[in-house]
């Protein structure tokens, strides 16, 4: 079974308490306090290796981790060591990866609205690969690039593919904020040929969405990209041969999710590309969620509760929508388990509510769990992606700590914010 087909990290064990990476989760919560993000190193490495193995029979396949899923220095070092480059979308992600002593040559800069400052910073830092979303960005790139920088670009297009996923994470449909419409490609190519001489057009890029289970969506994406590449090459006497098919491959958040394995997905990609092996010399793939999600869990401590007369029982935890906004944003579903020993406890139906001042701060609604008590530890699975990376300081609450576990050892890789750090960037004018 592929890692992305598992809800839990591969080292998860139930001894007396729940264990991951050889570490007792209840003891971790006591040592580091909660909320606490926990990343299992073995699961992360195994996931990376599945991708590398799936494409080991292909030349010139570039696996680029989508850093937006979770961009942390220690994790970037692990991911690089397993053979990945990095899809980055901001100066902050570039800075983080550079600070981890990773070469800028391993980065591809994406994003639909890169600022002047970000483009200039990327170029000055040594980033030379860009995926370009619009005409203004072409102009900015050419303006800031020097003649000797050899800036390689891909044009991001919207292929018109609507995959089965949440509306907010579809990106490949025609009505999208991302990329050039197919009808705009010729104008972009002509500008690069005739005006923007500092830019080297290498190929095309598309990204059709996130949390995708339908393999035919990727097949359709590749067919459209190759068809457009052929048309451009013929019309403009070019020899473009690079494709970037993005990421978006799905994971198993609940028992109702049935994602295909990494190997099954790779087989479809390779079989489709095999028809064009003489035309496509380089392929970029940008998995993010499917690399880091399963490796991560979040620990919460149970606090009080509220029993609505003749209604729901709300159980409160010490985190919620500030450390995981996805349930509130997308009605995202997760799987939760009591980390404490609970063999003798009866089951009950409860709603797990966060601590934040919003009625929508509900992590789980009407689920069955062993009877919960104050100071119990809940473990929410599959929180490696788009939890810490989307976290906020709502209600002036500090962002949680993150630890890496492996072989019964735990190491802090992100320190919990301090109260004084919450006001470090604030200023009171002298006139007040």
Spans of features found by a protein language model:
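Structured core elements
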Residues: 85, 108, 129-131, 154-156, ...
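Flexible loop/turn segments at secondary-structure boundaries
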Residues: 71-74, 95-96, 115, 162-163, ...
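A charged N-terminal "starter" segment
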Residues: 1-152, 194-196, 200, 234, ...
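Charged (often Lys/Glu-rich) extended helix/loop segments that serve as interaction or gating elements
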Residues: 268, 279-432
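Conserved, mostly hydrophobic/aromatic
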Residues: 44, 68, 90, 122, ...
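Active-site loop/helix belt of alpha/beta enzymes
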Residues: 2-7, 159-305, 369, 397, ...
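Short acidic, glycine/serine/threonine-rich loops at helix termini
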Residues: 76, 99, 119-124, 141-144, ...
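Glycine-rich, aromatic-flanked loop segments that form ligand/cofactor-binding clefts
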Residues: 150-162
């Amino acid at each position: 079974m592929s890692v992305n087909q598992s809800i839990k990290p591969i080292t998860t064990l139930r001894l007396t308490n729940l264990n991951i990476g050889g570490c007792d989760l209840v003891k971790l919560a006591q040592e580091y306090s909660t909320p606490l993000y926990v990343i299992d190193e073995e699961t992360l490495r195994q996931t990376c290796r599945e991708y590398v193995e799936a494409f080991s029979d292909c030349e010139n396949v570039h696996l680029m981790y989508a850093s937006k899923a979770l961009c942390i220095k220690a994790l970037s070092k692990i991911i690089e060591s397993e053979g990945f480059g990095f899809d980055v979308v901001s100066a902050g992600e570039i800075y983080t990866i550079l600070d981890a002593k990773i070469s800028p040559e391993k980065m591809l800069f994406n994003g639909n609205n890169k600022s002047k400052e970000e483009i200039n910073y990327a170029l000055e830092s040594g980033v030379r690969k860009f995926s370009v979303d619009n005409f203004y960005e072409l102009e900015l790139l050419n303006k800031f690039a020097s003649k000797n920088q050899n800036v390689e670009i891909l044009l991001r297009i919207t292929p018109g593919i609507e995959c089965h996923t949440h509306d907010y994470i579809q990106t490949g449909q025609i009505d999208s904020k991302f990329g050039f419409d197919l009808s705009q490609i010729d104008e972009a190519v002509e500008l690069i040929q005739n005006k923007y001489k500092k830019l080297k057009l290498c190929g095309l890029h598309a990204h059709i969405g996130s949390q995708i289970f339908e393999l035919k969506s990727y097949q359709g994406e590749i067919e459209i990209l190759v068809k457009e590449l052929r048309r451009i090459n013929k019309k403009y006497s070019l020899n473009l041969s690079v494709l970037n098919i993005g990421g978006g491959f799905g994971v198993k958040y609940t028992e109702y999710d049935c994602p295909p394995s990494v190997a099954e997905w790779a087989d479809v990609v390779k079989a489709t590309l095999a028809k064009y092996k003489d035309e496509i010399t380089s392929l970029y793939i940008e998995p993010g969620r499917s690399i880091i999600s399963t490796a991560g869990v979040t620990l919460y401590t149970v606090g009080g509760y509220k029993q609505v007369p003749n209604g729901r029982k709300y159980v409160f935890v010490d985190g919620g929508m500030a450390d995981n906004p996805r349930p509130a944003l997308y009605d995202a579903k997760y799987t939760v388990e009591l980390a404490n020993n609970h063999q003798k406890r009866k089951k009950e139906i409860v709603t797990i509510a966060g601590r934040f001042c919003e009625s929508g701060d509900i992590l789980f609604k009407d689920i069955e769990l062993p009877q919960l008590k104050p100071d119990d530890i809940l473990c929410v699975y599959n929180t490696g992606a788009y939890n810490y990376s989307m976290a906020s300081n709502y209600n002036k609450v500090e962002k949680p700590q993150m630890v890496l576990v492996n072989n019964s050892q735990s190491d802090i890789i992100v320190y919990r914010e301090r109260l004084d750090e919450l006001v470090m960037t604030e200023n009171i004018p002298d006139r007040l």
